[in-house]
Amino acid sequence: MSVVNFYGQLSNTQQFDQIRINIASPDQVRSWSFGEVTKPETINYRTFKPEKDGLFCARIFGPVKDYECLCGKYKRMKNRGITCEKCGVEVTVSRVRRERMGHIELAAPVAHIWFLKSLPSRISTLLDMTMRDVEKILYFENYVVVDPGLSILQKGELLTEEELQKAKDKYGEDAFTASIGAEVIQQMLKELDFSKLKQELYEELQTTSSEVKKKKLVKRLKLVENFLESENKPEWMIMDVLPVIPPEIRPLVMLDGGRFATSDLNELYRRVINRNNRLKKLIESKAPDIIVRNEKRMLQEAVDALFDNGRRGRAAKNANKRPFKSLSDMLKGKQGRFRQNLLGKRVDYSGRSVIVVGPELKLHQCGLPKKMALELFKPFIYSKLELYGIATTIKAAKRMVEAEKSEVWDVLEEVIREHPVLLNRAPTLHRLGIQAFEPLLIEGKAIQLHPLVCAAFNADFDGDQMAVHIPLSIEAQLEARVFMMSTNNILSPANGRPIIVPDKDIVLGLYYLTLAFDNEVGAGMMFSDLAEMEHALYNKFITIHTKIKYRRNQLNAEGKMVPVIIDTTYGRLMVGELLPSNPNIEFKFINKQLTKKDISLVIDLVYRHCGQKATVIFADQLMKLGFKYACSSGISFGMDDMVVPESKSTHINKTQLEIKEFEQQYSNGLITYGEKYNKVVDAWSRCTDRVANDMMKEIATLPVNDAPNHQKINAIYMMAISGARGSFQQIKQLGGMRGLMTKSNGQIIQTPIISNFKEGLTEFECFNSANGMRKGQIDTALKTASSGYLTRKLVDVAQDCIITEKDCGTDKGIEVKSVIEGGEVIVPLAEKILGRTAAIDIFHPVTNDLILNKGELINEAKLEQIESAGLDRIMIKSVLTCESTTGICSICYGRDLATGTLVSEGEAIGVIAAQSIGEPGTQLTMRTFHIGGAATKGAEVSSVDASYDAKVKIISRNVVINSEERKIVMSRNCELLLLDNHGNEKARHKIPYGARLLVDDGDMVIKTQKLAEWDPYTIPIITEKSGKVLFKDMVEGISIRDVTDEATGIPSKVIIESKQYSRGAELRPRIQLLDAKGEVITLSNGLEARYYLPVGAVLSVEDGVQISVGDIIARIPKESTTTKDITGGLPRVAELVEARRPKDHAVIAEIDGRVEFGKDYKSKRRIIIHPIDETMSIEYMVPKGKHVVVNEGDFVKKGDLLIDGNPVLQDILKVMGVEVLANYIVNEVQAVYRLQGVKIDDKHIEVIIRQMLQKVEVTDSGGTTLLAGEKIDRHEFDEINEKAIKNGLKPAEAQLILQGITKASLQTRSFISAASFQETTRVLTEAAIAGKVDKLRGLKENVIVGRLVPAGTGYFMDKMRKAAVKLDEENV
């Protein structure tokens, strides 16, 4: 027996390794068929038997009943294989009616609509005609000249009926041949000589210079090559014979009441057969041409409707005016074959019920209702009953179970013992949505769930339901126990932190337990053992909050027990008792008021140092303790717990005065409406925060009147500070003031809600508040769908990303450093490199000791060494630089976050990455409505303060001193660094153009000193010389307009769009500075002093006035602020991973050089960059209205922005390369999630980026068969080049391209995966023509063909099977 047969025994299906798709030839269709369907009848309405030669004919498709012919002459198994001589039916199983096909011989050829109408149309591309023309021929509107003969007509020219008649009169009947219908298209396709055509196209491609023509030729050439390679014949796109799918797949069902329900396909087939039969008769009876032609057209339309109803013309509809579901519709969309039946299946052995909390369960257990268990485990019970001789037969066992005899329950107990069940809660957004538990039988009808796993399932007990599934085979049980047991899923795969963390009331209980109060009874007493303390507590000598001293034995580094005396409380010691003994887990970690964060850290520590088992036990005991004290603490929620601060009115009055001042400035015309809006919103924002802070201070310390020595602690404050429930956001609204509200479009309403919920809202406030609330509700409804869609796209693009080897051996890596924003370290380096591997050997900068070897995993211990060495950037390996040809290697990926060890082979990291990014998206969209539309907006940054005592260093310092002796920054890329004594960078701040510098290069500053300040709401345009103002190209009403403010009546001059006027097309509004002689002043960089003004700029000077250095001549208002929340964020993530061009995108400088403004072209401004080495300068055309962030004469670096906005990802890739691009995408995506406090590991985003960078675009074909402009898989390209180099040819050249995830999914190597994703018909059409082969490497295609996925255990089965095949080959 060969080795591979052993694997074949696992299933009785045929073993195959790849699937190929082709166009079926007419002969192939006939070979599949078991007979021709010639009649449109289905079944006889009296006998209910299928009609002979009809759509359900038993002779063609097989018997209706097992082993029984139609007339009943042959019955039973003994006659198997006999064909009845009376009715012609073969005696066999009725199952063959699911697999036997028939066919219809068409009386006239018919075009296949997929090849005609699926864009780009394959038939028209091959014939080099337009699709419209081909349709005219096919649908009998025009004739086409096949052979011009003696006439001057062109081959392929279209003629109408009249033109044909005229041509016949002119040249004679037989001078030329013109024809019509699918026959002629078929003939034209047959006549194509592909080898010759390929040669001609190649030559034409070399000679043509027109880009449009090149594109067209490349398309046609690609198609010709596809046909040559796949050995498909082009005439097969026109069908002579039509396959009929098996009848069981298009069933006819009898309903009660004698009516029939039928599949739409039967109706569509009937139309085809009717028209085909009619056409046969017409041709036989030599009917007039016009009638035959009409019938042929009808036949073509009937076949079109069968294949893809509604693709062309009006869809065929049924009696209820609903379009019929055609064959294409059977495959397409969520309800199609792919997504409904192949990727998602209903599961037997499953049940569902409501969940309730089970606090006395252990972490690996769940409570399963007895009734449910009995039903689910039936087969196991039957076999056991029979085995023990309790029941004699299965039938008897069945009766016993139905009667619920007492023996049955005993057997059930035994069957269930150590047989894990899977619990699943929909929506399953990440892999922790399905986990395995050991069932405990319980009374009642609800499933009991352990409280600690709720976070992973995102379950609560307000009526949630969960499904139970039973793993049946031993292998399945084993996998459930090893991989899916809840105790094996302690860490979240998204960020590697514990997900089994106490929550809600457990946290509250532990917080209460670890509180320590001064002035409690027995303060300062000393104890040496716990029993003694318990005694003291019982006799009320101390309370659990009393501060006491205690002698505790602790493990030291050598593993010996040493006694130490600690200051603590009895409550904290109770938690301390639960800690596993380990020198790394010190008592100090819990000797404090425990909040949710602290508890999470302790669990993390326990997991890292003591392993999984200890963690599970610890978490379970912690939960029980938390529940106990949450109950006995008696914490409640009272009206008096909401405290309104005394200072509230003062803050509000102060802010109202500020706003009056802004109104005044606005009335005087000093600021625009937009600026006023921004300032008002900002002032209220600050006021709300101040009130909230005062309230928090008052709540935190609250003396109670009746017992002066007691310090009670506020219940609401406890809930929030411990992290149990509620946020300070919500408390602020209860006791402070509700603050600003958002409108439904995300804009902030200027008047805030001054009241809070305790005082109650006024009518007007209530209305405003409802507006914000409604936004939250609507958001939730709309965004959930788009978030789910994003997850689906991510899974689809990354599904074939699997760990396939240990080490790919690459030397490449990426450099990471901590993320600094506004001078603050937001993400420390440690967080970015934990769990990654080093790309190079890393040495200590001072001692030069080796810290890390190349390829070594950076764990917590190594992290400490790196931090103490003070390294600020590190080269790590990354998925992006991994050189594995299929999949990714373990070393480049690093730590598997769910286990904390190096990732193992076969791990499906692509799916995990997609789930990690998608899951919080869905979560966050659902969380919006909790805060109820209150605006969360950070006040705009308008100054920089020193965060350390340090020395100032200024990069790109370019300042002028204005008339008030202030230093004004003139540089666009000025940066201010703070350095410590060793010259190491501690903070870095970007100083915007126009800011006032308050310190200078080399100054020493102290912490909190102000370094620079600026107006955050406008971008100024500043002069660097004094002179007289001269307005140029400012034509009233065309390029400039006096805008009179409605509120104040004060006019201000604003630059407007001048494109729409013919006179305005050439205008470039600018201000020039003249000297005393009236000549234009020259600036320091040698250019003239002229300042171009963008659309929307507000002038601050009048024509002809004298101004001095550093004066503002115009201001560009920034748009008003809208709230930042994830809804702004999710579309941003989608925009990034879809690689879309952002609206109003930035322009990036491609080289280093000096900026010059060239001559304008129509409505565009010309920006020219001259490089230093005087090579080719680069020109950019930008719309005139856009604000250019560089001035003439500025020096820009490669990658700098010339225009504000989000840069186009493709530009970053082209100019700055892969690493910068990846860094940009990672940071942008992380910024969205960070705003919501969601942590996702960078590597997940990197996996998605790797999938987006799979393809290259050929720039030069060299000696290969590739075409310039062709897009091809990176690895495929490398393979082709290797072959070329072997054969001594010039290799092709190509550049990496970035694809959006949708496009990348549709262009994967696997056509099955692409077809099940989107645009099914197009994908299948393309694949069939090219004769594509699916190697079945991804997860999706394997699920669809019904094999084990090549990931996890399936990966090793696959590997072993391949090894077995190899062994067999060697043995042979």
Curated annotation (Swiss-Prot):
Cofactor note: Binds 1 Mg(2+) ion per subunit. Binds 2 Zn(2+) ions per subunit.
Coiled-coil positions: none
Cofactor(s) the record lists: Mg(2+); Zn(2+)
Keyword field contains Chloroplast: no
GO BP annotations, alphabetical order: DNA-templated transcription
Entry keywords, A to Z: DNA-directed RNA polymerase, Magnesium, Metal-binding, Nucleotidyltransferase, Transcription, Transferase, Zinc
Catalytic activity, EC: 2.7.7.6
Residues annotated to bind Mg(2+): D460, D462, D464
Recorded GO MF terms: DNA binding; DNA-directed RNA polymerase activity; magnesium ion binding; zinc ion binding
GO cellular component terms, semicolon-separated: DNA-directed RNA polymerase complex
Family matches, as Gene3D superfamilies: 1.10.132.30, 1.10.150.390, 1.10.1790.20, 1.10.40.90, 2.40.40.20, 2.40.50.100, RNA polymerase II, clamp domain, RNA polymerase Rpb1, domain 3
CDD domains the record matches: RNAP_beta'_C (cd02655), RNAP_beta'_N (cd01609)
Reaction(s) this enzyme catalyzes, per UniProt: RNA(n) + a ribonucleoside 5'-triphosphate = RNA(n+1) + diphosphate
Residue positions binding Zn(2+) 1: C69, C71, C84, C87
Top EC class for this record: transferase
Residues that coordinate or bind Zn(2+) 2: C808, C882, C889, C892
Functional description taken from the UniProt entry: DNA-dependent RNA polymerase catalyzes the transcription of DNA into RNA using the four ribonucleoside triphosphates as substrates.
Assembly notes: The RNAP catalytic core consists of 2 alpha, 1 beta, 1 beta' and 1 omega subunit. When a sigma factor is associated with the core the holoenzyme is formed, which can initiate transcription.
Family affiliation: Belongs to the RNA polymerase beta' chain family.
Entry protein name: DNA-directed RNA polymerase subunit beta'
Species this protein is from: Rickettsia rickettsii (strain Sheila Smith)
Native organism taxonomy: Bacteria, Pseudomonadati, Pseudomonadota, Alphaproteobacteria, Rickettsiales
